């Protein structure tokens, strides 16, 4: 699997079933650029979770809905409900643990 880019219109449908990880980011964000490849790699290794990315500048309504003030902001959703979030860059092993504990 890979990280699929979604927008505000896709969001509710994307996260409604199962476990989803959403990487809220922006093109100008340095730590976001570092985190992207980590999540891409994990998307191939943690196959029972869906991975998405959303640009907060292009989708400010969703960023506002979740009170996102800092990025990267990675949220785990289970059946459409946010169960946890992480703000800032964390290394691969820590991100894997964060995702696994919230599945």
Give residue spans per PLM region.
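Structural micro-motif
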Residues: 66-75
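Short active-site neighborhood of thiol/selenol oxidoreductases, capturing the structured segment around
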Residues: 15-25
């Amino acid at each position: 699997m890979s990280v699929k880019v979604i927008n505000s219109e896709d969001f509710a449908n994307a996260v409604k079933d199962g476990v989803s990880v959403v990487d809220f980011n922006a093109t100008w964000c340095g730590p976001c650029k570092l985190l992207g490849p980590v999540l891409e790699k994990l998307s191939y290794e943690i196959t029972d979770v869906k991975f998405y990315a959303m640009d907060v500048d292009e989708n400010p309504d969703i960023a506002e809905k979740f009170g996102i003030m800092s990025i990267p902001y990675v949220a785990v959703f289970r059946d459409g409900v946010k169960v946890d979030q992480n703000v800032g860059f964390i290394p691969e092993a820590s991100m894997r643990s964060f995702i696994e504990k919230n599945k």
